[in-house]
Amino acid sequence: MAYPFQLGLQDATSPIMEELANFHDHTLMIVFLISSLVLYIISSMLTTKLTHTSTMDAQEVETIWTILPAVILILIALPSLRILYMMDEINNPALTVKTMGHQWYWSYEYTDYEDLCFDSYMVPTNDLKPGDLRLLEVDNRVVLPMELPIRMLISSEDVLHSWAVPSLGLKTDAIPGRLNQATVTSNRPGLFYGQCSEICGSNHSFMPIVLEMVPLKHFENWSASMI
C-alpha cells in the first residue's frame, strides 16, 4: 500500500507490476536524457555569441534529428506494446471472479462456485479497530489464492467505475453493459489495497478494494466455510 509522502511506486507483487515498474524507469531515463540535452543546448545558445549566420541548410543535421527521435520512439513503444500484450493475455485461469461496481460499493461473485457471492462496503471510521486503515478497510475482503492466474470480470450496475489495485498493476474500467477482464497473479501472500479510480459520485472516495492473497489450502478452507 502507499504511505504518506511516498515518492516511488508501491512494491510490485505481480509479474505485470514488475514489468510496469521497469518500463517506468526505462522511459523516465530516456526523458531525463532528452531534457538534459535540450537544457544544455538552450544554455549554450544563451551564453555564447557564436552564430552561423551563413548556414542555409544542413542535410546531415536534419537527417540525424529525424532518425534519432524515431529510434527513441521505437525504444519506448516496443516495451509498451509487450506489456499491453501481457496484460490482455489470459490462458487457463485457475479461478474466475466477477466484480460489479455500484454507488458506492463493490460486489463479488466467484463463478466457479454455485453460491459464493457477497457485497464489500467500506468500514466506517467509527467502527475501525486498532491497526485498521482509514478509508481502506472493507467488511468483506476478496480472498484469492496466490501464485495462480485469476481472471477478473469487471462491470458496473449504474455509472462508470474503475477497479484498481496499484501494487498488482491493475486498473480496469467498470462500464455499465460491458464486461472487461483483467488478470490477477500475486507472487506472495498479503493484503493489497485499492480504490475506485473513476469519479462516480459524491461517495467516490469511499469505495475501497481489499484483496487477501493466501496459499491455495487456506483459500479452499475459506471457500468451504463461505458456501
Swiss-Prot record:
Instruction: Supply the EC number(s).
Output: 7.1.1.9
EC class: translocase
Membrane topology, record value: Multi-pass membrane protein
Note on how the cofactor is bound: Binds a dinuclear copper A center per subunit.
The record's listing under PROSITE patterns reads: COX2, COX2_CUA, COX2_TM
Cofactor(s) of this protein = Cu cation
Primary localisation category: mitochondrion
Binding residues for Cu cation A1: H161, C196, C200, M207
Ranges per topology, Mitochondrial intermembrane: 1-14, 88-227
Q: Enumerate the NCBIfam families for this protein.
A: CoxB
Q: How does it assemble?
A: Component of the cytochrome c oxidase (complex IV, CIV), a multisubunit enzyme composed of 14 subunits. The complex is composed of a catalytic core of 3 subunits MT-CO1, MT-CO2 and MT-CO3, encoded in the mitochondrial DNA, and 11 supernumerary subunits COX4I, COX5A, COX5B, COX6A, COX6B, COX6C, COX7A, COX7B, COX7C, COX8 and NDUFA4, which are encoded in the nuclear genome.
Name of the molecule in the record: Cytochrome c oxidase subunit 2
Q: Which species expresses this protein natively?
A: Malacomys longipes (Big-eared swamp rat)
